């Protein structure tokens, strides 16, 4: 697939946001040779996803903390589907995320999710792959980053409004998993609002930034 200038800029920006969030200074990806098992089950892969694998795909905290990036070392037949290429799973496979096979040549395709046992029903989780990679990185961050609030908080609408007023909202979200997930905060932070705006969990890769957000959020909500 030929990259346009805008594709290259967008991809660089996506990866830089993830590196900043996790405090990553070096790439940690699969080699081209290691990626070959994927091409025994699909003919094409979106360049953005391929480059994610070869740039960041081996980072454990980013990709294997709460939910899991499917890797070329996995038994790929476990995730075989006639219409979808599954590349991300919930840690007990209760939820699968995939790209429609008819969209695999698309630069920035939609990402679908399925939670039914037979995985016959799929719905759009994110309108673009870029949004999904960023949203999932921020979801994993609240469990993986070194400075984190231990546990979830239940919040009421007035407290959610205070969070929205205090912190910048990030321009991506998960539409269905966990009853929706929105993200707030600065570049090193993940303030996650889950379950239709009723749950809060947060973390940062920066100690000073965490202390700043914690000073505001620690008195908001009730521990679950």
Language-model features and meaning:
Residues 1-119, 140-178, 221-223:
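A surface-exposed partner-binding patch
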């Amino acid at each position: 697939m030929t990259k346009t200038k805008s594709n290259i800029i967008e991809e660089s920006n996506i990866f830089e946001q993830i590196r900043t969030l996790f405090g990553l200074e070096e790439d940690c990806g699969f080699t081209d040779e290691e990626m070959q098992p994927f091409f025994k089950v699909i003919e094409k892969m979106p360049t953005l996803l391929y480059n994610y694998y070869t740039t960041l795909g081996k980072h454990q905290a980013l990709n294997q903390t709460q939910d899991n990036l499917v890797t070329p070392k996995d038994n790929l037949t476990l995730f075989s589907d006639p219409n979808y290429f599954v590349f991300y799973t919930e840690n007990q496979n209760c939820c699968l995320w995939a790209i429609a096979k008819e969209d695999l040549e698309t630069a920035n395709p939609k990402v679908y999710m399925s939670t039914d046992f037979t995985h016959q029903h799929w719905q759009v989780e994110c309108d673009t792959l870029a949004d999904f990679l960023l949203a999932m990185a921020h979801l994993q961050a609240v469990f993986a980053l070194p400075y984190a609030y231990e546990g979830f908080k239940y919040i009421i609408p007035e407290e959610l409004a205070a969070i929205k007023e205090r912190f910048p909202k990030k321009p991506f979200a998960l539409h269905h998993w966990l009853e929706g997930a929105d993200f707030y905060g600065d570049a090193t932070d993940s303030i996650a609002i889950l379950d239709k705006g009723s749950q809060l969990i947060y973390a940062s890769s920066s100690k000073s930034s965490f202390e700043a957000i914690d000073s505001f959020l620690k008195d908001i909500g009730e521990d679950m």
